A protein has these predicted regions:
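Sequence/structural signature of beta-propeller domains
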Residues: 1-335
Length: 335
C-alpha cells in the first residue's frame, strides 16, 4: 500500500478541486483501521491543450477533527466517522464532507449509533459546523430511517444550495434493489443557511445481474453526485454483486418537476409522487475492465477546446485485489 507522511493512502471515497488554486482534495473512508479520519491534498496532471492525463501526486494530509478539536474515534465507537464525500465550497472557501454514520443491524447488533451528517471544516480539517439532518434521515436502533451503510454517500454544492443523497432506501421506503426490481432513495437539498429546502425521490436501478450463488451478497446504490447547475446533477450508481463484480453507470438527473417528499413517511415505488428524472450518460463497464469501486466525481480544469474535465475515481477498500483508479473525460454541456 502507498504511504504518505506515516499514513496509508487508500479508501479514497470522495474527490474535489479548488478551481482557483488547482488543488485537489481526496477524503479517505479509513475508520482508524490504519489512521484517523483524514483527507489528502494533491495534484492531477491534466494538460489543458491536449487533454492528456499523465499522473496523480499526493502533496499533503490533514486529520478531520470534532467540535472539541480531537480526531474522530475508530470504528465501533460512538461518534466514529465514515467519510464518503468531500466538496470544496468555492463560495465560502471551506470544505464540506459527508459522514455516512453507523448504526446496529441484525448482523452487527453491538454497533453504537454514530450520526450521519453533512459537516463543514476549514482547509486544515478543523470542524466549522454542520447542516441540520432531517428527522427522517437520522439513524436509529430500530428498523426505521436509513439502513446501515446507506447513509449520506454523495454530496454536491452550488451557489445557492447543498445537496446530499443517501446511498439506498430507508426501511420505510422499501427493500433494497434486486435483479428483478429497483428501489427508491432520497436526495435532500439545503439552502446556504443550512435549512432543508426539499427532499426528492431518486429511483434506483434494479441490479444488472443476479448474484452467483443466488443467495450471494449484493450492495448497490448511489455512490456520488456532482452538480451541473442548480437543478441538474451527475450521479454514479454502483453495484457490487457476488460472483459478478462491480457494475457502475453514470446518469444525469434533473430535479425540475419532482415532488417534494420531505413530509412523506414512506415512498412506495408506485406511489403518488414524481421522482427526479434520470438519463443514462455512460455505462462505465464499457471502459477499462475490470470495473472498480467507483465512488468519486469531480470537475477538473476546462480544456482549451471549451470542454470540461470530468474526473471519476475509485475507492480501493484497502484491498490488495482492488486499485485506486482515476479516469478523466472531456465532456460538453457542463457548467
Amino acid at each position: 500500500m502507498e504511504r504518505f507522511e506515516d499514513t496509508v493512502v487508500g479508501g479514497l471515497s470522495g474527490i474535489d478541486r479548488d478551481p482557483r488554486t488547482g488543488t485537489w482534495y481526496f477524503v479517505s473512508d479509513d475508520r482508524r483501521r490504519y489512521n484517523p479520519a483524514r483527507f489528502y491534498t494533491g495534484e492531477l496532471d491534466i494538460d489543458r491543450v491536449t487533454g492528456a492525463f499523465t499522473g496523480v501526486r499526493v502533496t499533503g494530509v490533514a486529520t478531520l477533527t470534532r467540535r472539541d478539536g480531537t480526531p474522530y474515534p475508530g470504528y465501533g465507537n460512538p461518534e466514529a466517522a465514515d467519510p464518503e464525500s468531500i466538496r470544496f465550497d468555492r463560495w465560502s472557501g471551506r470544505l464540506l464532507w459527508g459522514d455516512e454514520g453507523d448504526r446496529p443491524d441484525t448482523a452487527n447488533p453491538d454497533i453504537p449509533i454514530s450520526r450521519a451528517a453533512i459537516r463543514g471544516m476549514d482547509l486544515n480539517g478543523r470542524h466549522t459546523g454542520e447542516m441540520r439532518t432531517p428527522p427522517n434521515l437520522r439513524l436509529t436502533t430500530t428498523e426505521n430511517g436509513p439502513r446501515r451503510n446507506f447513509g449520506f454517500e454523495g454530496l454536491a454544492v452550488t451557489a445557492r444550495s447543498v445537496t446530499a443523497v443517501t446511498e439506498g432506501p430507508r426501511y420505510e421506503d422499501g427493500p433494497v434493489p434486486t435483479a428483478e426490481r429497483g428501489a427508491v432513495t432520497r436526495l435532500t437539498v439545503w439552502n446556504r443557511g443550512g435549512e432543508v429546502r426539499g427532499q426528492y425521490a431518486y429511483p434506483l436501478d434494479r441490479l444488472p445481474a443476479a448474484p452467483n450463488p443466488p443467495s450471494g451478497h449484493t450492495d448497490s446504490g448511489v455512490s456520488e453526485i456532482l452538480a451541473i447547475d442548480e437543478f441538474r446533477y451527475l450521479a454514479l450508481e454502483r453495484a457490487w454483486i457476488q460472483g459478478v463484480g462491480y457494475r457502475v453507470r453514470l446518469y444525469e438527473i434533473d430535479l425540475r418537476g419532482a415532488t417534494n417528499v420531505l413530509d412523506r413517511d414512506a415512498l412506495p415505488r408506485s406511489g403518488s409522487y414524481r421522482p427526479v428524472t434520470k438519463r443514462l450518460v455512460q455505462d462505465l463497464g464499457e471502459f477499462r475492465p475490470p470495473v472498480q469501486n467507483l465512488e468519486s466525481l469531480a470537475w477538473g480544469p476546462r480544456l482549451r477546446g471549451g470542454e470540461c474535465t470530468l474526473v471519476i475515481g475509485s475507492d480501493d477498500n484497502f484491498d490488495q485485489r482492488e486499485m485506486t483508479l482515476m479516469m478523466a473525460f472531456a465532456v460538453t454541456g457542463c457548467r
